[in-house]
């Protein structure tokens, strides 16, 4: 498989990989770090390690009115597919098993309920709650 980004370790460390959600016509680079400036550019890893490692990877992105980033995340349903491609080009498929809203101080979303888990989060349209999507690796 092809490498997604430059081959230097320094450049590789900037990215987690790519997220692809065909149902929503989403394909974005995911930054390996999280801050407000990076969130304006693309989704960011909020919590977790590498995709190849066991545990929960949390990815956060803005919910813009023009449907950029995670603006349509609320359209996802249980059993929908999310693809992640890591920095080395390895593809991982995740199946959604839960979707809910919570407040922005609920850090239970970081807990891993599965061996390999993916959590997506964004604000809802009123910006009062967070939309949470939980998925397990297929």
Briefly describe each language-model feature range.
Residues 1-138:
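Solvent-exposed, non-transmembrane regions of membrane-associated and secreted proteins
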């Amino acid at each position: 498989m092809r490498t997604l980004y430059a081959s230097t370790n320094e450049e590789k460390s900037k990215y987690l990989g790519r997220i692809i959600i065909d149902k929503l016509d989403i394909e974005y680079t995911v930054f390996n770090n999280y801050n407000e400036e990076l969130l304006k550019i693309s989704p960011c890893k909020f919590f977790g390690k590498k995709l190849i490692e066991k545990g929960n990877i949390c990815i956060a992105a803005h919910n813009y009115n023009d449907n950029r980033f995670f603006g349509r995340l609320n359209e996802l349903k249980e059993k929908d597919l999310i693809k992640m491609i890591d920095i080395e080009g390895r593809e991982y498929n995740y199946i959604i098993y839960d979707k809910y809203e919570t407040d922005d101080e609920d850090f239970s979303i970081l807990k891993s309920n599965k061996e390999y888990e993916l959590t997506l989060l964004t604000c809802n349209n009123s910006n009062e709650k967070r939309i949470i999507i939980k998925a397990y690796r297929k």
